[in-house]
Design a protein with these regions (language model features):
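Intrinsically disordered, low-complexity regulatory segments enriched in Ser/Thr/Pro
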Residues: 60-97
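Extracellular, modular beta-sheet/disulfide-rich ectodomains of secreted and cell-surface proteins
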Residues: 64, 101-102, 109
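Short intrinsically disordered terminal tails
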Residues: 1, 107-110
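Short beta-strand-to-loop capping motifs
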Residues: 19, 49, 88-90
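Short, conserved charged micro-motifs
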Residues: 17-24, 55-56, 95-99
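Amphipathic, interaction-prone secondary-structure segments
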Residues: 32-67
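Amphipathic alpha-helical segments
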Residues: 15-36
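N-terminal trafficking/processing presequences and adjacent post-cleavage segments
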Residues: 1-21
Length: 110
């Protein structure tokens, strides 16, 4: 499983689960995030994961839902760099499964 595309349409994706990971780990795994809507999300990743063995791909979104100052008020939120619980979205449950697999592979390799 590898990150194939960092510029994907996420229209129609929805929450599939949550992961625990620090910001730096996600940056190493998925690249730099893009700004979120600055209301309920501060940053987000939207990527396509590709499985070389099967040829299948999965769109995955990762975002900090309602954790920042933009939602909770100035001084009450958590900076993206300090977030450790992230929402995972996609078109189906494969998004959560494949992202978790990729995270476990990265952690085992470290």
């Amino acid at each position: 499983m590898e990150v194939k595309d960092r510029n994907v349409s996420i229209h129609g994706t929805s929450l599939r689960g949550q992961i625990r990971a620090d910001y730096a780990t996600l940056v190493r795994l998925l690249g730099e995030p893009v700004p979120g809507d600055q209301y309920k999300t501060q940053v987000e990743w939207a990527v396509r994961l590709y499985d070389e063995e099967t040829g299948a791909s999965t769109v995955v979104t990762v975002y900090d839902w309602k954790q920042g100052d933009c939602y909770l008020g100035e001084g009450n939120g958590t900076a993206p760099e300090d977030v450790t619980l992230w929402n995972v979205g996609g078109y189906n449950g494969n998004a959560y499964y494949h992202l978790n697999t990729l995270l476990m592979e990265m952690r085992e390799a470290a």
